[in-house]
Design a protein with these regions (language model features):
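Cyclophilin-like peptidyl-prolyl cis-trans isomerases
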Residues: 1-150
Length: 150
């Protein structure tokens, strides 16, 4: 294990996106496995891999297939807030294939990625453990996501 990182989620600014991420992470939101079509309410992110890692740019995960095209069996609309930007390393943002195609895939930045503003929903930022993010390699597993309120 590379270690842990801690992130703050911006529930007050992008509530639908955070509710989706938290619901999948905790297993309270139903999702459909992209291969088996089985419906589940288990913690979605536990055990998934970071299938896309570009050094000096981002790490991306959230596909149960580990290939980059799987998701939870639904999409939801983009949710943008003017104060949330890709303006630092450690930004958590939804990966998508265009407007309105958010599902479960997310990425965490290594650098400022301002060209992604208005295209990908920012929903959190890393508070501790950016070194863990920066050292993550393609295929590394996300053991679990723990949600807590502080």
């Amino acid at each position: 294990t590379l270690g842990k990182f801690t992130a703050e989620l911006f529930e007050d600014k992008v509530p639908k996106t955070v509710a989706n991420f938290v619901g999948l992470a905790e297993g309270s939101k139903e999702w459909t496995h992209p291969k088996t079509k089985a419906k589940s309410k288990t913690p979605y992110y536990d055990g998934i891999i970071f299938h896309r890692v570009i050094d000096g740019f981002v790490i991306q995960g959230g596909d149960p297939l580990g290939l980059g095209y799987g998701g939870p069996g639904y999409n939801f609309e983009d949710e943008f807030h003017p104060s949330l930007r890709h303006d630092r390393a450690g930004i958590l943002s939804m990966a998508n294939a265009g407007p309105g195609t958010n599902g479960s895939q997310f990425f965490i930045t290594h650098i400022v990625t301002d060209w992604l503003d208005g295209k990908h929903t920012v929903f959190g930022k890393v508070l501790k453990g950016q070194d863990v993010v920066n050292n993550t390699k393609q295929g590394d597993q996300l053991k679990s996501v723990t949600i807590s309120e502080e």
